[in-house]
Amino acid sequence: MALPSLGQDSWSLLRVFFFQLFLLPSLPPASGTGGQGPMPRVKYHAGDGHRALSFFQQKGLRDFDTLLLSDDGNTLYVGAREAVLALNIQNPGIPRLKNMIPWPASERKKTECAFKKKSNETQCFNFIRVLVSYNATHLYACGTFAFSPACTFIELQDSLLLPILIDKVMDGKGQSPFDPVHKHTAVLVDGMLYSGTMNNFLGSEPILMRTLGSQPVLKTDIFLRWLHADASF
């Protein structure tokens, strides 16, 4: 089953992720537990029909680029273009939609994006680029927001996503790239988000940044030119 209108990179990402997820070995046991080697999460015998994988599709959605697995391994959260999804993956190889919440860029931001000569067909949208587990009840998400990065907390209820409140959306500069094609990285450690991305509209100011948590915001100084202008995260 083919995904509708998905770019090759996004299509391949989901396929590779599910394939690797089912074959990924569990962590080695702690010392003193017999010294057994890594054990596979799932075992299949040759010829077993359950080895086949199904591909998820949802009409009107594309660019399933950002993935987050829940702690219990039963839910896969997916950041797409202008939406965040929760997929049930309890049945190996058969992802099913649990629920989905829209998070589009505002019409004002889309208009500003197009005015700055960006494409209103391929670029002026909110591409979800950061999706991390903040605590047991919230995810933290950031997106390009039509070349005006934004972030928000997403509340969870029984692993389902609750709607995003407009007044809870924050500036995401330094956490998400402006341009969806720019490389980026983000990891949450002890309640603090460490991110690396481009910090301006032109994509010429790379930055490393620490946000969230109780510590003050910390970031690299662009004037020191410690990072090369073409840095890739």
Feature map (PLM): residue ranges:
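Disulfide-stabilized extracellular ectodomains of secreted/luminal proteins, especially beta-rich
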Residues: 2, 6-7, 11-233
